[in-house]
Amino acid sequence: MVTKCIDPCEQQNQKRPVGHLVWDLIRISRYDKYNSFLALFSGVWSTLLAGALKLRNEPESTSVSFVLSRVVLCSLASYIFSGAGMVWNDWVDRDIDAKVARTKDRPLASGRLHTMEAMAWLIIQVAASTGLLYWMMEGRHVWISLVPPAIGTLLYPYCKRPTAQKFGIYPQYVLGLTAACPAVFGRAAIYNHEDSFQDLINASFPLCLFVFVWTLYFNTAYSYQDVKDDSKMKINSSYVFAGQHIHLFLVLLTGLVLASIPWVLHPLQSGWLWVSWMGVWSVGCAEQLVRFNANDPHTGGLVWRRNILLALWTIFACLVEVLLVWIHQI
C-alpha cells in the first residue's frame, strides 16, 4: 500500500478557512497597512493641482464635483495597482523574506499563501486598476502611461540583489520612478482631451521629480530598519551607498525634496500652498532629521510614518486650494 505524502504547507492551505485566505490576500497587498498609500499620493496631488489650475483658468469647462470624481478614480486605480505590486514583490522575495525578522511572517514567506493564489490575486488587481484608468482617462494614453510603472514594479525587487549594486542601481531609484508615474495619470484625468501625451509629461515633470527625490529620501530611511539582517544577506539598498554617512545623505536628500517644491507650486501662484506645503514640509523634514539616529535603525520607521502624515496633509492642502479657487470664482 502506497501512502501519499502531503506537504505541510499544502495541507495547511487545503484546510484553511476562506476568511483566513481573504485576510492573507489583504495582507500581501498591504491593504491592512498604509504602505500602498505611497502609490496614490502623486496621482491625487496631481489631480487636485491640475483641477485647481483649470478651475482658475477655464472655470466654464470643469467643476469641483468633476475634479473630486477624478480624484476618487485616480486614488482607487493607483492604490489597487500598488497592491498588485506588493504581491509581485513578495513573490520574488519570498525566500529572502523568510530569513528577515520583520518580513518572515508575510503570507508567502511563511507558507500560508500558495503562489498560485498570489498570482491570481495579482492579475485581478491589475485588471481592476487598468479598468479604472480606462474609465478615468476615457481610453486615451492609458497603455503608454502604464508602461513605466509596470516596468518599475517588475524590476523593483530584483534591484535589491547584489548584482544591481555593481551597476550603481539601487531599488529606491526604481521605486521613486514608479511612485512618481501616477502624477501623469492625475494630470490626464483633468487635461486628457486638451493635452498630447508629451504635454502631459511636461506638465507633470516637476511633481514627478519631487516624488522621486522624496521617495528616495524616506525609503532610504525606512529600509535602514533592516540594516542588520540585510547586511548578512548582502541586500542592495541606497543606505549601502551612504555607508556611515547615512545621516548626511538623508540631509542632502531632504534639501533636494524641499528645493523641488517651488517648481511644483509655481504654476498655481498660491500663497496658501506655499504655507501649507512648503512651510509645513520644511518644519516636518527638519523634525525628522533631528529624530533620526543612525545608531538606532528603528528611527527609520519614524521617518516613514512622519512622511505618510505629511503626504496626507498635502492632500488636504491641495483640496483646500481647489475649494478656495472655486469660492473665488463664485
Swiss-Prot record:
Entry keyword set: Membrane, Transferase, Transmembrane, Transmembrane helix
Organism superkingdom: Eukaryota
Its job: Polyprenyl transferase; part of the gene cluster that mediates the biosynthesis of 15-deoxyoxalicine B. The first step of the pathway is the synthesis of nicotinyl-CoA from nicotinic acid by the nicotinic acid-CoA ligase olcI. Nicotinyl-CoA is then a substrate of polyketide synthase olcA to produce 4-hydroxy-6-(3-pyridinyl)-2H-pyran-2-one (HPPO) which is further prenylated by the polyprenyl transferase olcH to yield geranylgeranyl-HPPO. Geranylgeranyl pyrophosphate is provided by the cluster-specific geranylgeranyl pyrophosphate synthase olcC.
Compartments it resides in: Membrane
Gene Ontology biological process: terpenoid biosynthetic process
Record family assignment: Belongs to the UbiA prenyltransferase family.
Protein name, UniProt field: Polyprenyl transferase olcH
Cellular component terms per the entry's GO annotation: plasma membrane
Transmembrane segments: 35-55, 71-91, 116-136, 142-159, 166-186, 200-220, 248-268, 270-290, 308-328
Pfam families assigned to the protein according to its UniProt record, in alphabetical order: UbiA (PF01040)
Membrane topology type: Multi-pass membrane protein
Natural source organism: Penicillium canescens
CDD domains: PT_UbiA_COQ2 (cd13959)
Co-factor requirement: Mg(2+)
Listed GO MF terms: transferase activity, transferring alkyl or aryl (other than methyl) groups
Phenotype when the gene is knocked out: Abolishes the production of 15-deoxyoxalicine B.
EC code: 2.5.1.-
Pathway recorded for this protein: Secondary metabolite biosynthesis; terpenoid biosynthesis
Additional note from the record: The 15-deoxyoxalicine B cluster is a rare cluster that contains its own geranylgeranyl pyrophosphate synthase (olcC), in contrast to other related clusters which rely on a FPP/GGPP synthase localized outside of the cluster.
